[in-house]
């Protein structure tokens, strides 16, 4: 995906919108049919992730919360403003509500840190528990729609690979 337009088109297809709705109603098969994105690509043993030509300048991170927690609704309501409020420090490129129980964030990779160190750093900054199972660099994220309720923040730097241009519009919140 090389442009905002293509990204939004994939997220807003009729199938995607229907599958997000079904996934949120507990349909596991519908979740598996959602558009998948990989925001973290690093050289791995045996070469790069198939189809990748270089290391990504971003890191994707899951922020999942247990819906049975007594403070679940509060976390879901407050976290977006908190993350967007630290967008510069975090290097936020994308924030979306996940299909089920939390959020996905994408932020600028700190090249002096490993994948795990990047995830630990972001977890500390945001104030959430580090997901020890989230260190797999080939992890994909099931995307949601491009609605304002799902796609909460998107910076065009996500599509330029860290090389913003004068033509790049400002981030949309």
Listing of model-derived features with the role each one plays in the protein:
Residues 1-57, 169-173:
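DNA replication initiation on ssDNA origins
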Residues 50, 54-90, 99-128, 147-149, ...:
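Modules that initiate DNA replication and primer synthesis
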Residues 54-56, 136, 163:
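Short, solvent-exposed coil/turn segments
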Residues 61, 95, 143:
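Hydrophobic residues at beta-strand termini and immediately following loops
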Residues 93-100, 131-136:
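Short beta-strand
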Residues 124-152:
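Flexible helix-coil linker/hinge segments at domain or subdomain boundaries
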Residues 154-169:
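Functionally critical loop-and-helix segments that line ligand-binding/catalytic clefts
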């Amino acid at each position: 995906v090389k442009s905002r337009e293509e990204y939004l088109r994939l997220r807003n297809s009729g199938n995607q919108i229907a599958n997000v709705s079904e996934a949120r109603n507990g349909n596991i098969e519908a979740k598996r049919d959602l558009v998948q994105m990989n925001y973290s690509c690093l050289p791995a043993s045996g070469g790069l992730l198939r189809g990748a030509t270089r290391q990504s300048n971003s890191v994707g991170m899951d922020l999942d919360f247990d819906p049975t927690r007594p403070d679940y609704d509060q976390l879901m309501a407050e976290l977006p403003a908190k993350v967007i409020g630290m967008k510069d420090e975090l290097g936020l490129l994308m924030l979306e509500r996940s299909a089920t129980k939390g959020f996905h964030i994408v932020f600028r990779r700190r090249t002096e840190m490993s994948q795990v160190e990047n995830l630990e750093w972001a977890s500390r900054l945001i104030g959430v528990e580090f997901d020890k199972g989230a260190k797999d660099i080939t992890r994909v994220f099931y995307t949601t729609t491009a609605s304002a309720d799902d796609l909460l923040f998107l910076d065009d730097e996500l599509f330029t690979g860290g090389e913003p241009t004068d033509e790049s519009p400002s981030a949309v919140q």
